[in-house]
A protein has these predicted regions:
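An aromatic-rich alpha-helical recognition segment common to small helix-rich domains
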Residues: 1, 12-14, 44-46, 88, ...
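Beta-strand-rich modules
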Residues: 33-56, 127-152
Length: 168
């Protein structure tokens, strides 16, 4: 949230599965929300306020934003079948997950598969059209998807995980 106006602070609301879970009022325009996420799909909104003595005057609510990520991700490589199996922990509220792979940490991701929320496992055989290479590090991104009204929305996520294919 940017504080381009003369406001005294911001009020944040956090929702899980459409239900209000927490309201936080901060004088700062930034808020660390990693502790709130903890394996949940969270929707949040924010509004500014101005202190007028004993009373606060609130502005309009922003639109909803969504965030969430898996708290635990594991990978295992089967050298006979040359497949990487990736498993992850449940994200509460997720309806499906989109799994992508890249050879770089922050770009070049190629979609592997979208799986239902109950599955939480994917087998990766290739990066694009090429087989996985021994000794190469691959970056896996798991994006939870939630239902927002009639739409399926991909959550913003900070969850990118690396896995190095063994050389043996």
């Amino acid at each position: 949230v940017s504080n381009n106006y003369n406001v005294d602070g911001f009020q944040w609301q956090f929702f899980v599965n459409g239900k209000l879970k927490k309201t936080v009022t901060e004088s700062s325009s930034s808020l660390r929300i990693a502790n709130f996420i903890n394996g949940k799909a969270i929707q949040y909104r924010v509004r500014p306020y101005i202190d007028c003595g004993a009373k606060k005057i609130y502005g309009e609510w922003s639109g909803f934003k969504s965030i969430g990520y898996a708290t635990k991700v594991t990978g295992s490589y089967n050298r006979k079948s040359k497949k990487l199996t990736v498993k992850w922990s449940k994200v509460t509220g997720a309806k499906s997950y989109t799994v992508s792979i890249s050879t770089k940490q922050s770009k070049g991701f190629k979609k592997v598969k979208t799986v239902k929320a109950s599955k939480r496992k994917v087998v990766i055989k290739k990066y694009g059209k090429k087989k996985l290479k021994k000794g190469k590090t691959y970056w896996i991104r798991i994006v939870p998807n939630i239902k927002s009204g009639k739409k399926t929305v991909a959550l913003k996520t900070s969850g990118v995980y690396s896995y190095r294919i063994p050389r043996y």
